[in-house]
Amino acid sequence: MIRHIVLTKCKPDTSQQRIEEIFAGLEQLVENLDGAQAFTGAPSTSPENLERGYTHGFVIDFDSWAALKTYAEHPEHKALGALLVANAVNGIDGILVIDLDV
C-alpha cells in the first residue's frame, strides 16, 4: 500500500470553508478512483506545536504506485491541486508531499 501524505501552509486569508471545499473535492475523487482506498484531511490540532507553519494535511491510501500515478495524472486532481497551491503560502513552496510504501 502507498500512503500519500500532503501538508500545506495555508495563507492566513484562506477560509476554512475554502479548504474544506478543496478537501471535499479530493475525497470525492478518491471515492470514484480505482485503487484509491481512503481520504482523510483536516487542520492540524497537534499539542506538540511542531507544525513549522503547516496548518492542514491530508492522507490518501493507494493500492499501488500505478494507482497513485493514475490519481496524479487525473484532470480533477490537477485542478484541485492548483487550488491548493493558489491557497498556500508561497505557492508550491508551501506544500510538502511524501509517499510511503507501507
Each model region followed by its residue ranges:
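Short secondary-structure boundary/capping segments
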Residues: L50-E51, A86-A88
